[in-house]
C-alpha cells in the first residue's frame, strides 16, 4: 500500500498529482483514485488495448529471425 508522506504533526502533506498516461488529466495519487495512474477505467482499458495491439512496447534488443540471415537449419 502506498502511503503519502506525512509531516511531523501527522497531517498529510501536499498530495502527489500525476498525469493520466492516456488523456493527460491530472489525477491525485491516493486511495481515492482506484485506477491510478489513470483517471478512469476507460483510460485504463484504452492503455491496455494499445499494449494488446502492440501499439506500445518496451524497447529491447532486436529479434534475430530468418530474415536476418539466422536459421535453425545447420545445413547438414
Curated annotation (Swiss-Prot):
Pfam families attached to this UniProt entry: YacG
Any one GO molecular-function label of the UniProt entry: DNA topoisomerase type II (double strand cut, ATP-hydrolyzing) inhibitor activity
UniProt region (Disordered), positions on chain: 54-76
Cofactor binding, note field: Binds 1 zinc ion.
Gene Ontology annotations of biological process type: regulation of DNA-templated transcription
Keywords for this protein: Metal-binding, Zinc
Domain of life, source organism: Bacteria
Compositional bias per record (Acidic residues), positions renumbered to this chain: 65-76
Cofactor(s) the record lists: Zn(2+)
Residues the record lists as binding Zn(2+): 20, 23, 39, 43
HAMAP family, sorted: DNA_gyrase_inhibitor_YacG
NCBIfam families, A to Z: PRK00418.1
Record-stated family: Belongs to the DNA gyrase inhibitor YacG family.
Subunit (UniProt): Interacts with GyrB.
Record's function text: Inhibits all the catalytic activities of DNA gyrase by preventing its interaction with DNA. Acts by binding directly to the C-terminal domain of GyrB, which probably disrupts DNA binding by the gyrase.
Name the UniProt record assigns to this protein: DNA gyrase inhibitor YacG
Upper taxonomic lineage: Bacteria, Pseudomonadati, Pseudomonadota, Gammaproteobacteria, Vibrionales
Amino acid at each position: 500500500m502506498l502511503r503519502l508522506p506525512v509531516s511531523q504533526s501527522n497531517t498529510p502533506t501536499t498530495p502527489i498529482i500525476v498525469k493520466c498516461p492516456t488523456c493527460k488529466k491530472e489525477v491525485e495519487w491516493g486511495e481515492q483514485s482506484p485506477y491510478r495512474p489513470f483517471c478512469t477505467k476507460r483510460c485504463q482499458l484504452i492503455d491496455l488495448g494499445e499494449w494488446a495491439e502492440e501499439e506500445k512496447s518496451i524497447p529491447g534488443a532486436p529479434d534475430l529471425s530468418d530474415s536476418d540471415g539466422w536459421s535453425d537449419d545447420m545445413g547438414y
